[in-house]
Design a protein with these regions (language model features):
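Glycine-rich phosphate-binding "P-loop"
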Residues: 1-10
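Primarily the HKD phosphodiesterase
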Residues: 10-72, 172
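Short, acidic/turn-prone active-site loops that include or flank metal/cofactor-
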Residues: 58-59, 81-84, 100-102, 119-120
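Short, charged, surface-exposed secondary-structure boundary motifs
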Residues: 62-65, 86-87, 105-107
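Structural recognition of alpha->loop->beta junctions
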Residues: 66-86
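Short beta-strand scaffold segments in enzyme catalytic cores
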Residues: 86-89, 114
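Signature of lipid phosphatidyltransferase scaffolds
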Residues: 96, 101-172
């Protein structure tokens, strides 16, 4: 039977869903800014070679998140325009609710959600699974690149060299 989740319960069961995933884990959320605990759990699942799909809907993926995601070989990231859904699903269960995968939301917002277990809520779980599959299909897979960050770093280093040179050379 479905279980109602408040903010802390949603966070707790999201962590449990990630920990208990054995085959696949799909995380669908417009916003991505993972807290350290979720990162640690996803890194562990990556080491276990679990198929992880992350779908996000806001294009402003922060460089720190992009850099971190790039290190995970078994995580596929996709962008879905107009995404507002928040659904976290594994082979054993599903959470549907208001919680974004955004560190701020998990700490500061009042959230609600529903936990569905595949064994207890088979029909509803299958409907949610099918919709999550559809969202993944219509999403564009994103290959995370560090090009922009590297260009910014080079420009920044060039500026630092100019400043150092300016301060080291005697004035004319």
């Amino acid at each position: 039977m479905a279980k109602f989740l408040n903010t802390s319960a949603t966070t707790y069961y999201l962590e449990e869903l990630i920990k208990q995933a054995k085959e696949r884990l799909w995380l669908i959320s417009p916003y991505l800014k993972f807290n350290d605990r979720i990162k640690e759990l996803l890194e562990d699942k990556n080491r276990m070679k679990i198929d992880i799909r992350i779908v996000y809907g806001k294009s402003e993926l922060q460089p720190a998140e992009a850099n971190w995601l790039k290190t995970l070989d078994y995580v596929r990231t996709s962008y879905c325009a107009n995404l507002h859904a928040k659904c976290y699903i594994s082979e054993g269960g599903c959470i549907i609710g208001s919680l974004n995968l955004y560190e701020f939301s998990q700490i500061n917002n009042n959230e609600m959600g529903i936990l569905l277990l595949r064994r207890d809520d088979t029909a509803v779980y299958q409907d949610a699974y099918a919709e999550a599959q559809r969202i993944i299909r219509i999403s564009e897979e994103v290959k995370i690149s560090l090009d922009v960050v590297e260009k910014q770093l080079k420009a920044s280093q060039k500026g630092i060299r100019k400043n150092i040179t300016r301060h080291l050379l005697p004035p004319n």
